[in-house]
A protein has these predicted regions:
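Short beta-edge strand/loop motif at the mouth of beta-sheet-based domains
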Residues: 7-8, 27-59
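Beta-strand/loop substructures that line and gate deep hydrophobic ligand-binding cavities in soluble
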Residues: 79-132
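A short, structured loop/turn motif at beta-sheet edges
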Residues: 16-17, 61-67, 92-102
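Hydrophobic/aromatic beta-strand elements that line small-molecule binding cavities or substrate pockets
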Residues: 8-10, 57-62, 86-95
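Short, solvent-exposed secondary-structure boundary/capping segments
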Residues: 66-74
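Amphipathic alpha-helical segments
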Residues: 13-32
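Short, highly charged C-terminal tails/helix-capping segments
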Residues: 139-148
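Hydrophobic pocket/interface hotspot
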Residues: 19, 29, 47, 60, ...
């Protein structure tokens, strides 16, 4: 059985600055991740992300342009995301030359939720599958923008 901490990595055919904009600008985020994004990416900022008919609050924790971004998110909407009731998502971008970026996404916090163990594992598994799909979408969105 996979653990409760999710780690996904992908090599993206785009410069780090382009990847950064795509993971931090609301109109870009909605092309590969959440359906609706109301968020300013600065430390301590509060926002909201909508996925289909579900959404949740978001609190930005770390912003180190263009290398690192982290935020806490929670659902159901209404609860303030804090340690213990939310997941921490961390994006780490590492340039691979001028035209490629290694992106690592880590999501933790499932182990701290007060859900029964089976439910906690189910959510972690769903998020693990979700991140694989979202990173595929991100890569596709950026590949479609490449000239030629």
């Amino acid at each position: 059985m996979p653990g409760l901490v999710i780690e996904r990595e992908v090599l993206i055919e785009a410069p780090a600055e382009v990847v950064w904009r795509t993971i931090t600008e609301p109109d870009q985020i909605s092309q590969w991740f959440a359906d609706r994004v109301d968020l300013v990416v600065e430390p301590g900022a509060h926002g909201y992300m909508q996925f289909g008919d579900q959404g949740g609050l978001v609190v930005v924790e770390t912003v180190e342009r263009p290398r690192r971004l982290s935020f806490r998110w929670n659902y159901p909407a209404g609860e303030e995301p804090v340690t213990g009731n939310s997941m921490l998502v961390e994006f780490t971008l590492t340039p691979e030359g001028d035209e490629r970026t290694h992106l690592r996404v880590t999501e933790s916090g499932h182990e701290l939720r007060d859900w029964p163990g089976e439910e906690r594992q189910r959510y972690a598994d769903e998020h693990r599958e979700g991140w694989a799909e979202y990173l595929d979408r991100l890569s596709s969105v950026l590949a479609d923008r490449r000239p030629g």
